[in-house]
């Protein structure tokens, strides 16, 4: 049995909301004046929002809130109750998941200063921890960001970033030369970045920290055909990766947001053996292989080439034809939109768990697109670049559902 905490997220949210109300009486004490919550997401409602237990896939959902003040990874049940917590030595950079051997594999954000420090997707360390949060080993890498995974051979595969050679950078199409936009994605560009371009490389690293394989985007992508697809994106970042996935044959699925590209890389030759790009996807995240051989993708949609309205959707792609064979999108389409991050997981019962990352919302849909479970992350924190208290965020890189048997096994082995 899993020890459940003696409080619910709903009760905590209610108590926190009541504690924050500033009340005063007027007109002889007959009128009650209360302060209105100024954080939009808190005001809309948090915690469990909907649940049909007979239609939702039974199990537990793991997630790590993405802000610097919290290093916890949470596991909740279908009722939104926290049933287990891992406390990590680093804030998330950006997520964690349970391994086949029952442990927690975690991407963390280190405090060391580097050119990645001004980006919210900075990483710096991956580690493996047991069920109680004890760190078994960790690997640091100054270029690591977004996502890393534990390979079947026991090594780790990391998304890393480095400067693109000048002769290649000059040929990359798209993007804005000057980018002074203030947003949650980029801190103000320091003068040192002027004229520079960074792009991704994959690094396979042993648990002892030895790099045994690398794959550099600028050596394989076409600067013209695979240019920066996002209209307002800075030229500072070319092929910035956000997800990596090991296929059964050892080949690698990787996703690159600024180029709106998903590729499959041959581990034997290093060649790109499959590619999906715009207009099918726009700023996508999290491609995974399904049992039927298709690929599931969270398609963010901030700069669509075939629609003037930004919206997100989840699509299932037949890689033999690159055709969409299933999709989920809201009605109207703009009701569901995460401009950054996002994830989709196909569940054993055929449903799909979707992470609308920017708003900390996880929801499960049937094949027909009906919502059978919905939860909004109630853990808020200040974003990495500060701001007033009302700017607190509850964003989550990805949420993952595990069966009751998987959690029991993880507790036993991990």
Regions found by a protein language model. Name each.
Residues 1-9, 17-23:
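N-terminal secretory signal peptides
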Residues 18-19, 25-414:
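Histidine-/acidic-rich catalytic cores in large beta-rich domains
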């Amino acid at each position: 049995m899993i020890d459940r905490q003696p409080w619910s997220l709903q009760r905590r949210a209610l108590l926190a909301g009541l504690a924050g109300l500033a009340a005063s009486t007027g007109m002889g004490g007959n009128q009650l004046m209360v302060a209105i919550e100024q954080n939009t997401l808190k005001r809309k409602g948090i915690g469990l929002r909907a649940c049909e237990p007979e239609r939702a896939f039974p199990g537990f959902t793991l997630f790590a809130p993405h802000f610097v003040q919290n290093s916890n990874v949470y596991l909740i049940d279908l009722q939104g109750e926290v049933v287990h917590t891992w406390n990590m030595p680093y804030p998330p950079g950006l997520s964690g998941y349970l391994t086949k051997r029952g442990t927690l594999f975690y991407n963390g954000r280190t405090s060391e200063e580097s050119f990645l420090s001004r980006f919210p997707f900075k990483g710096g360390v991956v580690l493996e921890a047991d069920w109680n949060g004890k760190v078994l080993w960790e690997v640091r890498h100054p270029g690591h960001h977004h996502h890393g995974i534990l390979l079947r051979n026991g090594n780790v595969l990391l998304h890393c970033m480095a400067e693109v050679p000048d002769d290649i950078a000059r040929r990359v199409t798209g993007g804005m030369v000057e980018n002074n936009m203030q947003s949650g994605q980029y801190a103000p560009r320091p003068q040192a970045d002027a004229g520079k371009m960074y792009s991704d490389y994959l690094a396979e690293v042993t648990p002892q920290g030895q790099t045994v394989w690398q794959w550099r985007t600028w050596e394989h992508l076409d600067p013209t055909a695979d240019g920066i697809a996002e209209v307002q994106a800075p030229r500072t970042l070319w092929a910035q990766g956000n997800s990596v996935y090991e296929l059964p044959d050892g080949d690698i699925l990787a996703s690159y947001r600024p180029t709106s590209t998903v590729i499959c890389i041959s581990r034997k030759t290093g060649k790109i053996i499959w590619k999906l790009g715009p207009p099918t996807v726009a700023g996508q995240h999290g491609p995974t292989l399904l049992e039927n051989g298709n690929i599931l993708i969270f398609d963010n949609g901030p700069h669509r080439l075939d629609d003037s309205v930004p919206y997100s959707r989840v699509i299932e792609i037949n890689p033999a034809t690159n055709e969409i064979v299933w999709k989920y999108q809201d009605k109207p389409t703009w009701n569901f939109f995460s401009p950054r991050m996002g994830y989709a997981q196909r569940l054993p019962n055929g449903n799909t768990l979707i992470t609308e990352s920017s708003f900390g919302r996880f929801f499960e849909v049937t094949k027909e697109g009906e919502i059978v479970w919905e939860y909004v992350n109630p853990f808020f924190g200040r974003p990495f670049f500060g701001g007033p208290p009302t700017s607190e965020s509850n964003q989550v890189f990805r949420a993952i559902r595990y069966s009751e048997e998987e959690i029991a096994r993880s507790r036993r082995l991990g």
